[in-house]
């Protein structure tokens, strides 16, 4: 921040020194407003306003076998064709099927697969990968398949309440910080895709009975 003097300049300089040089900038200096990445579908791109907004997380939600994974794969395939350096990380909490990916046009040799369904492991890996600013796309497939370690260690009859919701909310707070990119300095953008499924709430008489795994924990 330039052209300032007095107490305000001292405060801004102190904050930028403590939290990073781009923490406070002039509005007129902002040039990196975030772009968009094609979904591989013209119709979906139009609905999204030009494609997936970068440096953000997007939830692909629907019933089972409704094409959520296909949308993620088509997004990867379209951008691999556009950019030879396009790099993807796929968190395979369920599975990674090379033959299906290739049928959707994906070059599997340019996709790195994280094979775990333990929630803490997956979330920590994703946060570190996003912080690296070295990838273009990261997909979590899927949220319902992730299991908190506390639940994984228990027997079927033992209850665990709210652990997944708490971890998921903590993850989004931390990955939100990791997803932040400079407003004035060019940095590699990315998109995050999370695949989720509808579930039905028991005993709902009015309103939409649908809900999603993830919960409302804080």
Please annotate each region the language model reported:
Residues 2, 129, 161-218:
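Phosphate-binding/switch region of NTP-binding enzymes
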Residues 12-13, 145, 151, 200-205:
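N-terminal cationic and glycine-rich segments that engage phosphates or anionic surfaces
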Residues 109-120, 151-167, 206-212:
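Flexible beta-alpha connector loops of hexameric P-loop NTPases
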